[in-house]
Regions:
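Conserved N-terminal phosphate-binding loop of PLP-dependent enzymes in the Aspartate aminotransferase
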Residues: 1-128
């Protein structure tokens, strides 16, 4: 793979020595991502949907502790979550993460809609 640079950028020895950051392509991509985050109000969406999920998840007596911020959520259980994660992925097609043996991690995209959040809760309830 290669990158073409406009003649308006004068390459200087050592300026383009990294493939993972600080180059013009990476900077342009980062700026484009920041534009989308701002234009689509993704930070505000993450807070609103995250607050909703946190409140709804606290209603499940099977969960020992609900913690998180925005759409980065951890659900601590008394028992190991391996079987719960298997049921979520295989039966309900819901992908989750884990932290240790007893914490289920939720890390959905910032563009998660209220409809999708409610769908997750319905599927989650089915496997508990």
């Amino acid at each position: 793979a290669g990158v073409l640079i406009s003649p308006m950028f004068k390459p200087v020895y050592g300026q383009l020595g990294t493939t993972f950051g600080g180059n013009h392509l990476a900077c342009s991509a980062a700026l484009a991502v920041m534009d989308v985050i701002e234009q689509e109000n993704l930070v505000e969406n993450a807070k609103a949907i995250g607050d909703y999920l946190l409140e709804e998840l606290k209603k499940f007596p099977q969960i020992k502790e609900v913690r998180g911020r925005g759409l980065m959520i951890g659900l601590e259980f008394e028992e190991p979550i391996k079987e719960l994660r298997s049921r979520l992925i295989y039966d309900e097609h819901v992908f989750t993460g884990a932290s240790g043996t007893n914490v289920l991690r939720l890390l959905p995209p910032l563009c998660l809609s209220m409809e999708e959040a409610k769908e997750f809760l319905a599927r989650f309830k089915k496997v508990l």
